[in-house]
């Protein structure tokens, strides 16, 4: 029983660390979160629709909210997911800078 409790504590720590990593990654690419939990980060952006569409074309699903225009990003499932998200954010910003 004590082992299960310690596992729960470690899992919470891991989720909190992953959430901070997600917030940092989003912020590095110009999408600083306005809120979140240990499971997701919420970003308000005038470019929410365009970013959602760009990420969806790469198989990265985020939740779009209309008012205010915002996105909810869940934690990537594994390291490959983190890499895909970083690539998606980077290529979106590159594409936007060409406009």
Located regions from the model:
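Structural signature of PLP-dependent enzymes
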Residues: 1-24
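Internal amphipathic alpha-helical segments of the cytochrome P450 catalytic fold
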Residues: 8-12, 52, 82
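Conserved PLP-binding catalytic core of the aspartate aminotransferase-like
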Residues: 16, 24-58, 75
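A general structural signal for well-ordered alpha-helical segments in protein cores
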Residues: 19, 48, 82-85
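Short, histidine-centered active-site or binding-site loop motifs used for metal coordination
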Residues: 4, 37, 66
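PLP-dependent enzyme catalytic core of the Aspartate aminotransferase-like
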Residues: 54-58, 64-99
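Short coil/turn linker and secondary-structure boundary residues
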Residues: 3, 46, 77-80
